[in-house]
Amino acid sequence: MARRAADKRVNLAVSRIIPPILIGVFGYASYAITKPLCVDYLIHPAHHYDRRSRSGAGAAILAIYYVLLIPVLATYLRLLYNVVLSPGYLPRGTACTQNQTGSDGSKHRHRRHRRRKSGHHLSKTTEKTDRSDGGDVERGLEYSARAKAYPLDAEGLESFYTKDVFVCQPDGRPVYCSTCCQFKTDRAHHCREVDRCVRKMDHFCPWVGGVVSETSFKFFIQFIVYTMIYCIFVLIVFAIYTAELRREAGRTNVHWIVCLALSSLFGFFTFGVAISSVQLAANNLTTIENLNRRSAVWTLAIRVPRHILSKRWAPTFRTITYPLPPVPPAESEVARESPGGEQHVFAILQTLPGENPFDLGSPLKNIQQVMGFSLLEWLLPIKQSPCADHSSNESAFALGPVVTRLKKEAGLEVSTESESADPVGAAETPQHEQRRGKHRRRN
C-alpha cells in the first residue's frame, strides 16, 4: 500500500515536471536549427567553415521548420489545457465528499489536540495522541464502510435509465465505483494516479501532464502526429548537414548531434504511439479496453419498447425495471416513495467474447467519433470530439451493429407498424421524450 502511494506521488510529480522540460526541448531545437545551422552555416557561414552562402536553403529550412512547429505547439498547449482544466473526471458521490470532509476534520482536531498537549511529558503525549488517533481512525473506517456499501437505490440512476442503452452489471444496475461512491458512466475507468473516475479514460501520460480521456484523446492524436512529422523533418535536416560537415571538414557540431539524437528518439517514439493511437481510434477502443478486447464481454441494459410491453410478453432473458423500489427506511428516516409515473423496463443482454458494442462497423466512422466529421476538425485543435457529447437519448456513446444484433435476437427492435397501431404508446412517447429531454438539460 505504501509503495503504491509512493508510485502515485512519483507519477504525479513527473507529470508536472515533464511538460515544461518538453517545451524547453522544442525551444532548444529551434535555437539549434536557427542559429548554428541556418544562420552560422548556411546563410552567413562562419569563417572557419570556409563555405559560400546558401541563403535559399537556409530560408527554406527555417520556413518549413516553423510551419511544422506551430501546429505542434498549438496542439500541445490545447492538450495541456484539456488535461489540466477539463480532464473529464466524474463527480464524486455525496458519501465520498462527506467522508473526505470528516477526514479533514479529524486531522484538524488531531493537530489541535497535539498543540494542546505539547507541554506534557513525551511518553504521556505519545500515549494520549495514539489513543486519540485510534478513535478518529476508527470513526473514519466506520464511515468508509458505510459509504462504500453498494447503494440499492441512489440519486443519479436517472441519467442511466433515461437512455435506451447503458453498460451495466449482471444485475442490471450501472457499474459502481466504491472509491468515488459514484455510478460510473459507460466506458469510465478509475485512475489510481489521480484517484478519480474518468470518462472514457485512455491512459495516464506524464508527457502531457495527466490523464488522456475523451476530452483530450483527439488533441493527443493531433499532437503525436504533428510531432512525428516535425521530428522526421528535423532528423533529416540535421542528418544531411552533419554528414556533409563531417565529410568535408572532418568534424561535427555538438548542437547538431544533440538535436539529431533527440529527433531520432522522439521520432521513433511518436511514430509508434501515433500508429497505436490511430489503430485504437479506428476500432473505437481505449488503451484500457484494448488490453482484453479479445475476451471482453459487455453487459448491456437495453430498453424494452412500449409496443412489446403492451402485449403478453414472456422474456427469455433477465430484466430490470426503473425506478428501483424504495429502500426500507431506517428508524429515523422516512421511506422515499417510488415515483408513480412511467416505468422503464430494460433487458439485460451480453455480447459475445471479443465483441465491441461501440464499434460502428467502419474504421472511418470510428475515427470520426474521435476526430470529427470535417477535414478542419481533423487538422485543427479547436472542437471537442463528437464522442464527448452525451446528449443522445439512445446511449452515452454511438452504438454499432453488435447492439443492433442483440436487439434483433431478443426481439426488441422497434417496429413502426406496432407503434402506430398502439395509440396509447404513441400518445405517451412524446411525453416520455420530453421528460428525458428535461432531465438531460438539467444534467
Swiss-Prot record:
Cellular component aspect of the GO annotation: endoplasmic reticulum; Golgi apparatus; membrane
Pfam families: DHHC (PF01529)
Catalytic activity reported: L-cysteinyl-[protein] + hexadecanoyl-CoA = S-hexadecanoyl-L-cysteinyl-[protein] + CoA
Enzyme Commission numbers on file: 2.3.1.225
Localisation: Membrane
Post-translational modification as stated in the protein's UniProt record: Autopalmitoylated.
Ranges of Basic residues composition bias in the record: 107-123
Compositional bias segments (type: Basic and acidic residues): 124-137
A molecular-function term among this protein's GO annotations: protein-cysteine S-palmitoyltransferase activity
Ranges that cross the membrane: 17-37, 57-77, 220-240, 256-276
Start and end residues of each stretch annotated as Disordered: 96-137, 410-443
Domain of life: Eukaryota
Keyword terms of this UniProt record: Acyltransferase, Lipoprotein, Membrane, Palmitate, Transferase, Transmembrane, Transmembrane helix
Bilayer topology term: Multi-pass membrane protein
GO terms under biological process: protein targeting to membrane
Domain spans labelled DHHC: 175-225
Comment field on protein domains: The DHHC domain is required for palmitoyltransferase activity.
Similarity-based family: Belongs to the DHHC palmitoyltransferase family. PFA5 subfamily.
Name of the protein in its database record: Palmitoyltransferase pfa5
Encoding gene per record: pfa5
